[in-house]
Amino acid sequence: MRSAEAPSDDSQPPQSLRALIGVIGAGIFVTGFGWPGIIGRLPFSLLLKNQLHMSADRVAVFWAIATLAWYVKPLAGFICDAYPLFGTRRRGYMLAGSALAGLFWLTFAVVPRGYASLVAVMTVLNIAMVFVSTVVGGLQVEVSQRYGATGRLASLRTGLEGVMNLLAGPVGGWLAVRAFGWTALSGSLVMLSFIPVVAWLDREPRGAPVNRQRASEVWSIARSHLGTIVRSRSMWGATGLLFLVYLAPGFQTPMLYYQQDVLKFDPRFMGFLQTLGGVGSIVGAALYGALCRKVPLRTSLIAGILLNAGSTLFYLRYESATSAALIDGAAGLVGTLATLPLYDLAARATPPGVESFGFSLMMSIRNVAIFVISDPLGSYLYSRHHVGFKQLVWLNAGSSAAVLLFLPVLPRALLAGREQSRAAG
């Protein structure tokens, strides 16, 4: 609800669609590529492993704690909606969040190389980035609805994610063999580059009021959305399936130790392997885009769960540079085909009227499964109980395949039909 003192948005000249798409595209890129888990995954993990001499489970716990803000991303959305910053609902958060994120990135260059100090700085960095990411996502939804640009913006996000995956490997590998200050500077420059884009292209008018009535309305909507979600059997069924699929003991961090300590891979080659996985993911996404119009979701889910378990078994032959390159590329392709049906299910299961909040809530629960449970559990078994890398592969594959037992819980109507048939209906 607009207050009487606030200027009407209708009196302002409409913003250019091209300019808004520029802001959205830049925002997606900087909050993705500039996230420490992308550009800084190798440099940070190898710093903790080789300089601070930490075990795999402590490295996994580091990432679990430091990415805490991403688990409660829906909360950031409600805060942004309820409390404008510098008289705007978007622009202020994007500018302030990017500036703070750039500053926190630079702090890594001077902060003492200790576990607690690194966790503290990365935690506040992630908080700043979550607010930027949340506002950019809200802007994407708003522009999609206002201009009928859902397809273009969805394609933009997918394309940029592909570019990020391709760049993250070689850039992360290059940074991992240089002084850590280069990583801090690189992350800072990525985040700070968003400031001139927002300042130049986003012409959101000032005057959004901070009033208790608006905040009360936003939190009332939040309670209503939560009530709708709690009553949705489809929503909780899909959320449970997502959680269980990603709950299997993971080996992301143990694989880094295995690559360095057993296979003696150079960090730059490890970055190259990430790039191959990114290429496979892009190809897999393109293939699923065609298959989802021809194959019912139930079939895709069953095949996806089996593919997820099967592609994991590729890593049993992860024994040389050549096999690693082939396996990472193939696993990226097959793994994407395996997981995209889960996101299709998540989108279908979200109750009408709470699409953005419901979907982000499911993704937050997925993140908890990956970062708080799966990777730390696998790393704990690897470090403390001396479970070998290949034993972890078997454990992960078996746990993933067992999720098939959960499928009968999902409503039949949710799994019926292809994407095209649902759209037609």
Language-model features, listed with the residues they occupy:
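Juxtamembrane intracellular "pre-TM" segments in multi-pass secondary transporters
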Residues: S3-R18, E204-G237
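Helix-to-loop junctions at the C-terminal end of transmembrane segments
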Residues: Y71-T88, A176, V283-L297, Y382
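A membrane-interface helix-boundary motif in multi-pass transporters
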Residues: R89-G92, W174-V190, S379-A401
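C-terminal transmembrane helical hairpin of 12-TM major facilitator-type secondary transporters
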Residues: R298-L342
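C-terminal ends and interior cores of transmembrane alpha-helices
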Residues: L95-R113, L306-E319
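Glycine-rich segments within core transmembrane alpha-helices of 12-TM secondary carriers
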Residues: W70-K73, G151-G173, M363-D375
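Helix-loop boundary and gating motifs at the non-cytosolic
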Residues: P7-W70, W236-L241, V245-L263, M270
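Multi-pass alpha-helical transporter architecture, strongest
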Residues: F108-A109, L192-D202, L392-G425
